[in-house]
Amino acid sequence: MGIPRTFLHCFLGSLLCLTGSQALQCYSYEHTYFGPFDLSAVKLPSVSCPEGCSEVVLSLDTGYRSLVTMVRKGCWTGPTTGPMQTNQDALPPDYAVVRGCATDYCNSNLKTHDALPNLSQAPNPQTLSGTECYACLGTHPEDCSPEKSRRVQCHQDQSACFQGNGRMNIGNFSVPVYIRTCHRPSCTTMGTTSPWTSIDLQGYCCEGHLCNRASVTQILPGTMSSAPPRAPRILTLLTAAPLLAIALGASVGFPA
């Protein structure tokens, strides 16, 4: 497990002052995707913004080819700088890009899923832990029922199974998420945080063949149909986009 790192960077001078009294015209868009997105041919509406424009992409992945991605474009809100804490070993994997700018219709850079890395990339060489878990990710409990979940062979040191639920947040744009996937026995709870985005997950890890088949709407473990979990660890994962102090005119993307 890596040691959490904290960054605080301050942008001085005019970058902190969102200059100009005239309102900017910015693209406005909010949508949740369950696969790759492409906005290159989409005509986006506009909105008048007093301070600046922003565009944010936030993605959560099981690590086994199931993902939920939020895309938001609109007015810049929140602080222009802020602290970040991250742990590269936290699971499940996530990624975020936050970009701010201060000219008309400048929030048009993040158009396709190419802005994100592959969060389900198999290790090379491809080694397996010998554990099999259910894997799913969706925005409704029925999206993650055992019947709709895939059985996956876990990678490398991921010898535990995880299940849980929570919310993905970009400002006041928020969606629920329900998830099952592989995890490490440590069931790392130290995710990442930032002032602009967050993914707040509650759940637990278990050990045993396909042990993560209980209801994803409950936090405490129920009766398992296979081997009982070893000392389930109740956890809250804060897997927010690890963003370090962005000023308008900059963009940052980090994995967790």
Swiss-Prot record:
The keyword Cell membrane applies. The keyword Amino-acid biosynthesis does not apply. It is found in: Cell membrane. GO terms for cellular component: plasma membrane; side of membrane. Transmembrane segments: none annotated. Gene3D superfamilies: CD59. It is a lipid-anchor; GPI-anchor. Keywords: Cell membrane, Glycoprotein, GPI-anchor, Lipoprotein, Membrane, Repeat, Signal. Glycans are attached at N118, N172. A lipid is attached at S225 (GPI-anchor amidated serine). SUPFAM superfamilies: Snake toxin-like (SSF57302). Coiled coil: none annotated. Residues 226-256 form a propeptide. InterPro entries: CD59_antigen_CS, LY6_UPA_recep-like, Snake_toxin-like_sf. Residues 1-25 form the signal peptide. Residues 133-212 form the UPAR/Ly6 domain. Its main location: membrane. This is Ly6/PLAUR domain-containing protein 5. It comes from Mus musculus. The gene is Lypd5.
